[in-house]
Amino acid sequence: MAAVDDATGLEAARKQKIHNLKLKTACLENEELVQELHVSDWSETQRQKLRGAHLKAEELVAAVDVGTKWNLTEVYDLAKLMRVCGLEMSQRELYRPEDKAQFMDIIAMKKVLQDLRQNRNKTRVVSFTQMIDNAIAKVEKVEEDVRRSQLDATQLAQVPTQTLKQVEDIMNVTQIQNALASTDDQIKTQLAHVEKTNEIQNVAMHDGEMQVAEEQMWTKVQLQERLIDLIQDKFRLISKCEEENQAFSKIHEVQKQANQETSQMKDAKRRLKQRCETDLKHIHDAIQKADLEDAEATKRHAANKEKSDRYIRENEDRQEETWNKIQDLERQLQKLGTERFDEVKRRIEEIDREEKRRVEYSQFLEVASQHKKLLELTVYNCDLAIRCTGLVEELVSEGCAAVKARHDKTSQDLAALRLDVHKEHLEYFRMLYLTLGSLIYKKEKRMEEIDRNIRTTHIQLEFCVETFDPNAKKHADMKKELYRLRQGVEEELAMLKEKQAKALEEFKESEEVSGRCWHRVQPPCDENNEEVLTRRSKMVEYRSHLTKQEEVKIAAEREEIKRALTAQLWCRWRAGPHRKQHCTHASNSVAAIIM
């Protein structure tokens, strides 16, 4: 298509050139005829012919003024415009009216935001509703601006991709309150069972049903161990939620990267806009300069034309005068004819130059206007791109701020919840540790009692063996039964101590937290030791009270035996000397027994 246009332009220029040449030839031929008439015979007819030729010359000169045209095809093009005006921007770097805007990625981003608006977690803890609505409004504004431009928004649409992904991920994070609801219900159920077990144990101990009380204590230990397991489950759930939430701690890096991308895009468009504005200024300056030159040239040509017309008129007037002096002024007439020929020739050349200049000026204005439109369109698109990029940057900033708020709030809630769970762990560990401590104390006392019974049974067995007492079999069976019972109690005691050590090991983390947060909390170990010492002190008081009563009875019995023995010895002493030695031996034996 461009080749056809060039061929058509060249053909038109060729025809116009032929036409101009014909006009010049006709005018010059007529001037030559004028010169020939100057040297011909001087007659009235010749003079009339000369006048007619002058009239025709005026018409031909007027035709040259009106009919001379120039079609320039290569005088002014874009390369010459850029060279003359010192332009930087080539057409490859400029937006064109036929360029189509690329905004499908913007529509896809709006679709992502609309999907996020339907997310079930968008109003939890930190609301995302307002942020998403603002983002959709900004994206719609960007889409509207891009549709009215020739911009390619593909790269711009990629900027908030990571931010929107972070928003979607944090909206889908597990809600810790819902995750812990089932565990809290199980803890409440276990606490209710523990309370019921305590009631049954208290009733059994009040009624003296020690076996039932011991079974209830074992049941309570199992329930409290289950409470510890549930607490550990809560810790695991909290840790899992913390791990999910930790992924959003570096949201500032996402925002920083997005800001860098938008800054680069803005800087690129600003540089492009600045270059276009610089070229526009150069074109405006060139147009103003061309306008001044055109005005000066037009004024100069008009002055030359007026001068030429005046000169031709004067020439004709002088020719008329010369006709009256034909004989005297022949040489002058010929000279004037020659001068006229030269002037007409010079004028034709001046007309050619002026018309050529006008065409060049017109072409310059046309090329400059087209390039000016492209530059102005590019500046417009740069402004739109900068505004759209700013809107996307605001979108990214608001999204990152919402993600950070959600992350900070979730971290605070998890920290507070972890502290509450540590409090629950302390309470349930205290219950379990005190229960195990009470059982261990009772089992140890039971062990001591069995050991005393074993020693007593062993002594009784030795007495029976010494005298071949048939009850020896009974004491031997009882001793075996006591050893079997002792082994069972020892295994239970070892199991209880193992449970106590395991619970203490699992309590270390909560113990550290309680040491940092609750300085006045009494450790369950110290509380258990105090209860054991209190229990032992109470038992010692009971034993001391019983021992005092036994000592009084024994002392009274010993006093009675002593009095009876004294009376008997007195009687034997009086019975005769042969019994003195026997009485002395008996007295020593009885004294030893009494002691």
From Swiss-Prot:
Its main location: other. The keyword Cytoplasm applies. Pfam families: Flagellar_rod. Coiled coil: none annotated. It is found in: Cell projection, Cilium, Flagellum; Cytoplasm, Cytoskeleton. Residues 294-317 are annotated as: Disordered. The keyword Membrane does not apply. Residues 317-337 are annotated as: Calmodulin-binding. GO terms for molecular function: calmodulin binding. Heterodimer of a 69 kDa and a 73 kDa protein. Coded by two tandemly repeated genes with almost identical ORF: PFRC and PFRD. Major component of the paraflagellar rod (PFR). The PFR is a highly ordered lattices of fibrous proteins that are located inside the flagellum and assume a fixed orientation with respect to the microtubular axoneme. This is 73 kDa paraflagellar rod protein. It comes from Trypanosoma brucei brucei. The lineage of its organism: Eukaryota, Discoba, Euglenozoa, Kinetoplastea, Metakinetoplastina.
